[in-house]
């Protein structure tokens, strides 16, 4: 199984809805050290995977999800459509269903159009700024709360799905960072074999 332990730790703006008080410097240092050692663990309050389908076939993505024990895919694309066969919403949901994996599309957690344009242009800093602003909207916060509830429940194990192969250049790393502000997480960034 191709699992890459992510070492991503990106700060997000805190709001009164997401965090009442900023952690001390000592707490931030401990959180940073813990996030650098991410691993799958059942003793943490939350565990999740992330996966991107760039350069992969649907069977490879589903196989990687199955090997990791994922039972629910949370699609965090703004537009759940793809020119790549098997990755549009209905096709993906059907393929996942055949493998015994559920599907949920949380469209409000998708990247707004301006962010997608920045990503296509390779302007990752702009993507992050745009997405961080978007993540503070009411609808995004509601969906983030729904996602946090699913992660806290710990069953089923879920995976955030988006297009980008590299989580470091994808908005799903920002979603993970926002979840980490709410709870400790064990995160696996799954990388399916390329086609």
Residue ranges of each PLM-predicted region?
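Residues lining hydrophobic/aromatic ligand-binding pockets adjacent to catalytic sites
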Residues: 2-195
């Amino acid at each position: 199984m191709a699992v890459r332990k992510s070492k991503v730790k990106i700060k997000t703006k805190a709001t009164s809805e997401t965090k009442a008080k900023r952690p001390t410097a000592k707490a931030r240092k401990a959180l940073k050290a813990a996030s650098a050692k991410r691993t799958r663990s059942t003793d943490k309050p939350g565990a999740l995977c992330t996966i991107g389908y760039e350069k992969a076939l649907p069977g490879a993505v589903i196989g990687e999800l199955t090997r990791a024990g994922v039972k629910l895919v949370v699609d965090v694309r703004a537009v759940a459509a793809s020119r790549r066969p098997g990755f549009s919403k209905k096709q993906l949901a059907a393929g996942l269903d055949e493998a015994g994996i559920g599907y949920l599309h949380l469209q409000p957690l998708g990247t707004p159009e301006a962010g997608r344009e920045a990503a296509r242009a390779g302007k990752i800093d702009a993507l992050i700024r745009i997405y961080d602003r978007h993540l503070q909207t009411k609808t995004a916060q509601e969906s983030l709360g729904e996602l946090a509830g699913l992660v806290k429940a710990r069953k089923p194990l879920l995976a955030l799905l988006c297009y980008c192969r590299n989580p470091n250049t994808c908005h799903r790393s920002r979603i993970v960072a926002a979840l980490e502000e709410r709870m400790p997480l064990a995160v696996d960034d799954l990388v399916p074999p390329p086609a």
